[in-house]
């Protein structure tokens, strides 16, 4: 894996020197991340329809790669599930599942891919993104089979996120899980925004907000 990352870093360095590949790197930097944050979870860069996309890997419950979540680089927030002709089932997979520690009995759930990267950057590795606001029955069953006992809901600080957190709290408790809801304070919308407020001491800030 280390050898693979080294080769990818060299390749991305060459890309970065080319003007047309600077935009994705600048986009990552503005969101508080660096190249290694992307590469460490099997991320990459893709071109589709002459547009640049950041790719993150989707794995099924057997840790098999089944596709990619692609985020469009730019101001417009747009996502695609790849391959387009046979998109992976969101209800039967998780973004970055392969990188979830197996020895944990607690899982942190966030809404988006960049929220997930922010948690990992802060040292909270037992985290998964919903890539939305719902959790499927198959995903909950996977948690039960994986001996997950406690779920910490860390959704966005907006109306939709608060409603979803309340719904998920009820559903998860009915399924037998211990549930904790962590709500962001003030006008901070999500965990990626919080990262941008505390770039130099992010690990401490994240743990403080999670009351760890």
UniProtKB/Swiss-Prot annotation:
Coiled coil: none annotated. Residues 105-187 form the Toprim domain. One of its GO terms (biological process) is DNA replication, synthesis of primer. It comes from the Bacteria. Signal peptide: none annotated. GO terms for cellular component: cytoplasm. InterPro entries: DNA_primase-rel (IPR004611), DnaG_primase (IPR050219), TOPRIM_DnaG_bac (IPR034151), TOPRIM_dom (IPR006171). It holds the Pfam family Toprim_2. This is Uncharacterized protein MG010 homolog.
């Amino acid at each position: 894996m280390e050898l693979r990352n080294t080769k990818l870093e060299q390749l991305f360095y060459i890309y970065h020197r080319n003007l047309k590949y600077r935009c994705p790197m600048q986009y990552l930097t503005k969101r508080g991340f660096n190249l290694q944050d992307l590469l460490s979870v099997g991320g990459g860069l893709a071109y589709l329809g002459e547009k640049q996309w950041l790719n993150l890997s989707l794995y099924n419950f057997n840790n098999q790669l089944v596709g990619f979540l692609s985020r469009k680089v730019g101001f417009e927030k747009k996502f695609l599930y790849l391959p387009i002709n046979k998109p992976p089932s969101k209800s039967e997979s998780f973004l970055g599942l392969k990188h979830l520690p197996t020895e944990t009995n607690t899982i942190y759930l966030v809404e988006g891919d960049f929220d997930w990267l922010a948690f990992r950057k802060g040292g909270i590795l037992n985290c998964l993104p919903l890539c939305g606001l719902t959790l499927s029955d198959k995903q909950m069953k996977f948690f039960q089979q994986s001996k997950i006992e406690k779920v910490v809901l860390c959704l966005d600080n907006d109306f939709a996120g608060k409603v979803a957190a309340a719904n998920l709290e009820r559903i998860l408790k009915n399924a037998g899980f211990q549930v904790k809801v962590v709500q962001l304070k003030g006008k901070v919308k999500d965990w990626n925004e919080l990262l941008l407020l505390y770039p130099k001491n992010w690990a401490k800030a994240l743990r403080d907000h999670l009351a760890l």
